[in-house]
Amino acid sequence: MPESRLQRLANLKIGTPQQLRRTSIIGTIGPKTNSCEAITALRKAGLNIIRLNFSHGSYEFHQSVIENAVKSEQQFPGRPLAIALDTKGPEIRTGRTLNDQDLYIPVDHQMIFTTDASFANTSNDKIMYIDYANLTKVIVPGRFIYVDDGILSFKVLQIIDESNLRVQAVNSGYIASHKGVNLPNTDVDLPPLSAKDMKDLQFGVRNGIHIVFASFIRTSEDVLSIRKALGSEGQDIKIISKIENQQGLDNFDEILEVTDGVMIARGDLGIEILAPEVLAIQKKLIAKCNLAGKPVICATQMLDSMTHNPRPTRAEVSDVGNAVLDGADCVMLSGETAKGDYPVNAVNIMAATALIAESTIAHLALYDDLRDATPKPTSTTETVAAAATAAILEQDGKAIVVLSTTGNTARLLSKYRPSCPIILVTRHARTARIAHLYRGVFPFLYEPKRLDDWGEDVHRRLKFGVEMARSFGMVDNGDTVVSIQGFKGGVGHSNTLRISTVGQEF
């Protein structure tokens, strides 16, 4: 009988585990962290993926982040990081208030929401511009409109005409210029990409970004539209679909079919859906991604108090840990690293929390669940990945070394959540960067030229992988390692599994 989760928890040894963290950390770079020195410090603390938030900042700013990231990379030879572009997406916002003043709105206050653009720069507490032309066509009396992440709620009283509706404030608060607007339980018909998004994606392609975090994805067609917009030059960019509204939830299965991965963006999701339900939604979506073998990111307010405080709340630590236990491949920091006072400390706390959470996982029981739930027959590569995970569990192996061109084998290995690190050896920098999306994968760039002797070339790459694992304290002489490689060069031939002993074969 495999060790159950309950048995695993009852027998836990409390303290810092003697292993490396497998959950990746994504950090948003903002004005406080946009320097080579700051990015290097974040990487040393545990950062794996840089996020560029295109809801803020100029092209010049984002260009400088990319340049600083490239400079920082030189201090980590063979360990490239990934850069992700987070689109602004099809958001709805209020207009600019008169003189940019913050408008106080008392409870029960009635006012007009208008789509008349003549009020776009002169909104006041009597009439407020909303930049969604079809607002009066999609909403009905009795529905609610949330402003500024739900800080202010309004009930729709009357549709006056095609441009105006009357609302009543449910609570008191302030409205400032250009605040976000949410329409819960209302199907909006915004295009998946705005003109700004198109320009931003073109910027990303030109500057070699590796991942797109696509905001407010509602259908599979939205994902395909982004893929088309990236064009042939951006065909290798991975698309991570952000699920942050009811439409995205309703169409999740079709989105998962076509996307490269998923981000659970709990901020906007928690506005449109009851906050307690987000807990269950997070677990459900992560499980679906795990079963599909696609990476999933948990994001929003994970260590939010550390924006201004040196220590997180206990609830925040539990939130990070539970996201890891739910099965997230990556956890993400937003304002904590973009504008916070303690960015490096936030990454350190997140890394330490993820590491301890990982030590509580009952890997054999988890592997059995994943294997049993996977439809059969599986592809050759996935069959080998599952067999490698089983071999590690049965032989108490310390590492899996995989030689890969595209990283697909490493992704499938990650799906089965082996109890050891996955050492990815690749000659392709983009493959190494993208691998940070997959839990447990440690990518290493192998730069020597390919030998004419295929067998010798394979041996040298495997030896390199074992040496890298040894240098990071993952393996030592006498340890068992499992390796996966192809019987010939090229893509899609990972079909050979080998069990070796460190210090003998390598």
Swiss-Prot record:
Top-level taxon of origin: Eukaryota
Site note Transition state stabilizer, residues: K242
Residues noted as binding Mg(2+) in the record, renumbered to the chain: E244, D268
Catalytic activity field: pyruvate + ATP = phosphoenolpyruvate + ADP + H(+)
First-tier enzyme category under EC: transferase
Residues reported in the UniProt entry to bind ATP: N53, F54, S55, H56, R93, K179
Cofactor(s) this protein requires: Mg(2+); K(+)
Keyword ATP-binding: yes
Residues that hold substrate according to the record: R51, G267, D268, T300
Note: Present with 2130 molecules/cell in log phase SD medium.
Function: May be used by cells under conditions in which the level of glycolytic flux is very low.
Annotated protein name in UniProt: Pyruvate kinase 2
Species whose genome carries this gene: Saccharomyces cerevisiae (strain ATCC 204508 / S288c) (Baker's yeast)
